[in-house]
Every structure is written in C-alpha cells, then in structure tokens.
C-alpha cells in the first residue's frame, strides 16, 4: 500500500488543476490491485452499471468457467496479474485501448488528464513486488500533488508527485 504517514490525507473531491471523475473501487483480495485498477478505468469509460465485478474479470483473464471465481471462489483465482493483463481487461471490457508510457513529469500528467485520459501507474512496493494505482488528478504548484485511486485504500487520497515518482516504474495511458 502506498500510505505515506503524515503526507496522506483522504479527500472526497480535491481541487485540482486536472481532475477526472474515476470511480474508486477497493480490491477484493489482497492481490487484486491490478483487477481493481482495471475496474476503475472500465467504470470511468462505460459507467458503474456496465462494469463487471472483479471476480468476472479474473475469470476472463484466466479463461475460467463462469462462476469459478465468483461463485465457487476457487483459490486458484486469487493471484497477481501483469500490466499487460490490465491493458487487456480495459480493452476487452472497457472498449478502450491503452498506450504504455514511462513515468511522466507533472506537466505531462496534467496534459494527459486534461485530455480525459486516466493514467495507471505501476509502482515498486518491495524488493520483488509491485502495486497498481490510478492517477486521476493533479494539483500543480511548486510541489505538485497527485490525486490517486489506490485499490488498497478506502478512498482516494493525495500524494506528493515527488514521492510517487520515486516508486513509479511503468505506466498505462487509457485512450
């Protein structure tokens, strides 16, 4: 999880120089940040009512029979996913293609968000682990703040760009 101690505060709707109303969903297992991040983007693109549950998306990725992950709750369904799988879920369920991008500077983030395109950031959380968050807003200034949908957190929060930049290893821009 990306909680930053004193620099973290929860917010309903922060004033931002660029802001997208991407719905926030928490991950339903300890390792489904990738599915929850994709679900957030699909809900932004198609609406919450047209967004499948996380377990259905895992079934689709795994090629599992319907209700294997949702109904039975098979332990094989609880696994990590790749950034490619996130992009594929967004294309399949959300009808939107994605571009892979390197970590960006605040001005690129602001321009991307102002064009209506959310950004998924893959961040390092340990020596061999990563986490996926959705960047949905930025407040510019001497020390820019990002508005993040973190699937592990109960609500969106702001984080200094400089902190996220030190952890950010890969990105997806949803077209």
Model regions: which residues?
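Bacterial N-terminal signal peptides
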Residues: 1-9
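Conserved active-site-adjacent core of cysteine acyl-enzyme catalytic domains
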Residues: 20-21, 42, 56-175
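Active-site nucleophile-adjacent alpha helix/oxyanion-hole segment immediately C-terminal to the catalytic cysteine
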Residues: 16-66
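N-terminal signal peptide c-region/cleavage motif recognized by signal peptidases
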Residues: 11-13
